[in-house]
């Protein structure tokens, strides 16, 4: 179905847009293949920092390819969910992403290459644990709100926190609150969880689950844990 007076409507859209800005989608400034190589190197380094031997396998290859695509594709999505069982590399990937963004020193949108070397001109990447978010919400609401202003926010272990928390007689829902704020701000978010997609809906409700579907690309970790006794002796990467 076509819009009547399409040219006129387009002009009205431009008129109404004056003074409004679209939130830029964070992307790595490189092609997908190069992003894969950088991610692989960053991932290997995180494994080595844990005194483990990196083992390249099909699971890791597919996970890295999916994340590289998320970070370079021209899409409306502005986040990644790393979901799957315990100990299979999700937090390792999150930390690898954080280090990569920091090392690349990526300029924020609308800044020229001559903008200077102030840290405020480059994307930062903050990681916080879900349980820490609950505590921050209870003790420092201003700091809690600042989390929703981070250039890129990584939330580790969503689903391990209590669904509701009592604070001075009132029930609060810190993760649901923060996810709603991040959705409104449209800032890039990465989180890890052991929850299945249907469990995310059960824990946080239809409203948040639907918003997460709009915001984020799911990368499902299907490999078993790297934390078994044998893996700890040889190939652990979790």
Where are these regions (language model features)?
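Walker A (P-loop) ATP-phosphate-binding motif of ABC ATPase nucleotide-binding domains
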Residues: 79
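Hydrophobic anchor at the beta1->P-loop junction of P-loop NTPases
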Residues: 82
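Walker A/P-loop NTP-binding motif
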Residues: 99-102
């Amino acid at each position: 179905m076509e819009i009547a007076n399409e040219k006129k409507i387009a002009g009205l859209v431009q008129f109404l847009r004056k003074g409004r800005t679209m939130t830029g989608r964070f992307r790595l400034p490189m092609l997908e293949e190069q992003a894969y190589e950088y991610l692989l190197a960053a991932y290997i380094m995180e494994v080595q920092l844990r005194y483990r031997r990196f083992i390249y396998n099909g699971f890791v290859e597919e996970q890295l390819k999916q994340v590289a695509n998320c970070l370079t594709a021209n899409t409306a999505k502005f986040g990644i969910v790393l979901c799957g069982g315990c100990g299979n590399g999700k937090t390792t990937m999150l930390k690898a992403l954080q280090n990569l963004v920091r090392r690349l020193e990526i300029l924020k949108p609308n800044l020229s290459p001559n903008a200077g070397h102030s840290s405020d001109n480059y994307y930062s990447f903050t990681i916080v644990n879900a349980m820490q978010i609950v505590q921050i919400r209870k003790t420092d609401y201003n700091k809690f709100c600042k989390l929703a202003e981070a250039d890129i926010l990584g939330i580790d272990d969503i689903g391990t926190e209590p669904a509701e928390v009592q604070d001075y007689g009132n029930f609060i829902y810190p993760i649901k609150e923060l996810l709603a704020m991040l959705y409104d701000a449209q800032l890039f978010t990465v989180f890890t969880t052991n929850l299945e997609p249907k469990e995310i809906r059960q824990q946080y409700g239809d409203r948040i689950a639907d918003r997460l579907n709009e915001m984020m690309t799911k990368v499902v970790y299907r490999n078993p844990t790297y934390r078994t006794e044998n893996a700890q002796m040889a190939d652990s990467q979790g």
